[in-house]
């Protein structure tokens, strides 16, 4: 009864899973495994591991950041929808946009959202570098990303999308602190300021996680993000 395990874990953080939410997570797992057979969405397919390392891991940021408010979230490179779809299931009032460079993942997300009957979600097939130059630049309350690149690179992809006064919530595994040191220059150049750092353990010794909350204090200079591929090849680092 893996969804019951998730419910028990969340109860320890004063979060109650409704019957509807339980059904949504069960459907999410079923579709993830079905679609994963025809496209590579995740290397984690064991049911308990998905609930622990994808679902619980995606919801854990809400222990430290208030997602229970009507805010717009952009999730950069969410793959199979992590963390934003589990957060949307838990906090239905969120307005969620996912940007991903692989169209097959967007097809999965569209089908998933339809099956889960999610409202106020949109999935955009684009590179984050291009998306951050367009009409959505500096338009989101919160931008999130879960370990898709080093923090110096992620900051250039994500901070341009955050509105002034909003937050970039970066989710990393255990090496986050050294990445944060390296990324401080880029964060400052891009208009951000690190305001909170949280370190926590997943249940069952499944690993350490770090979460950085970066406030958007100033507008990002127009030249950022640079053209696709450049942030990854030559990250913004202090010379």
Curated annotation (Swiss-Prot):
The keyword Methyltransferase applies. The keyword S-adenosyl-L-methionine applies. CDD domains: AdoMet_MTases. It comes from the Bacteria. Signal peptide: none annotated. Keywords: Cytoplasm, Methyltransferase, rRNA processing, S-adenosyl-L-methionine, Transferase. GO terms for cellular component: cytosol. GO terms for molecular function: rRNA (guanine-N7-)-methyltransferase activity. S-adenosyl-L-methionine binds at residues 77, 82, 128-129, 146. Pfam families: GidB. It is found in: Cytoplasm. Residues 215-239 are annotated as: Disordered. NCBIfam families: rsmG_gidB. This is Ribosomal RNA small subunit methyltransferase G. The gene is rsmG.
